[in-house]
A protein has these predicted regions:
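Non-heme Fe(II)/2-oxoglutarate
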Residues: 32-34, 38-41, 45-49, 53, ...
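Short, conserved beta-strand element in jelly-roll/cupin
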Residues: 98, 131-149, 193-194, 201, ...
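Short acidic/polar capping segments at secondary-structure boundaries
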Residues: 110-117, 128, 135-136, 144-149, ...
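Double-stranded beta-helix
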Residues: 147-209, 231-234, 250-251
């Protein structure tokens, strides 16, 4: 179901909108169970990356590895459960409203915060990872668990997407980057507690942050970033890891 006029205006003004109960329980359960299978190594991830919490001991969670994230568009190529999710009409209808009828997937990831050891994600803009024009792609954040301030819910800086792309710097582990040009703190942000099946639609230039997970429960979410099929790389030599996947509508020669 598309956004209401009020929700659409909020997205344009604030750079985000949360749609409650966007996905049904069966969909949430299927995605959660599939992610858990990869966490337990019951399924092999051959077309996407698996990253662990940098400071957690391997045995911190017993039979489950302290996985921080699975990353790569290969997630939807390799696994039908993830492919069905990124094509779910409840999500795609909203993205069409924001981006138009021709859509490619730019990113897919499972963002996890394991109990007690889930680390923070510093303030950043998703657009900083991707040399894409126009710089307006939509990040979709699907809550698979109850997401709270205690376990690391999304926190955003409303309206800051209008400031454009800010300078970023690399952080000390994996592929993370953090905003260096502005000094945001959690006091600048609005926390977005969410229930399983709620979906956050977020402008790629919106600064956001998640705190560590200090609870005894997992905080799991699935991310899908959608761009217009006419999008182009702004760099002649884009990063090798940048990928795309046709979601709906037409594709265009010379575009991403």
């Amino acid at each position: 179901m598309p956004l209401t006029d009020e929700q659409f205006e909020q997205y344009q003004r604030d750079g985000y909108v949360v749609v409650e109960d966007c996905l049904d329980g069966a969909t949430v359960e299927a995605v959660t169970e599939r992610i858990d299978a990869y966490v337990r190594n019951d399924r092999d991830a051959t077309q996407f990356e698996r990253m662990l919490e940098p400071d957690a001991e391997d045995a911190a969670l017993g039979d489950a590895d302290p996985v921080r994230k699975f990353e790569g568009v290969g997630m939807v190529r390799e696994d039908d459960v993830f492919a069905e999710l990124v094509r779910d009409e409840a999500i795609v209808d909203v993205v069409r409203q924001l981006q138009g009828p021709n859509l490619h997937l730019l990113r897919s990831a499972a963002m996890l915060k394991p109990p007690r050891v889930g680390s923070e994600k510093k303030f950043h803009q998703d657009a900083a990872y991707y040399p894409i024009h126009p710089m307006d792609h939509v990040t979709v954040w699907v809550a698979l668990d109850q997401s709270t301030t205690e376990n690391g819910c999304m926190q955003v800086v409303p309206g800051a997407h209008t400031d454009g792309l800010l300078g970023h710097e690399a952080v000390e582990y994996d592929t993370d980057i953090a905003i260096s040009e502005a000094d945001y703190t959690p006091e600048d942000a609005v926390a977005l507690p969410m229930e399983p099946g709620d979906v956050l639609f977020q402008h790629c230039l919106l600064p956001h942050y998640t705190a560590p997970n200090e609870t005894e429960d997992w905080r799991r979410a699935f991310i899908a970033a959608y761009m217009r099929s006419r999008s182009r790389f702004t760099d002649q030599n884009p990063p090798e890891w940048v990928d795309s996947y046709d979601v709906t509508g037409d594709s265009f020669r010379g575009c991403v």
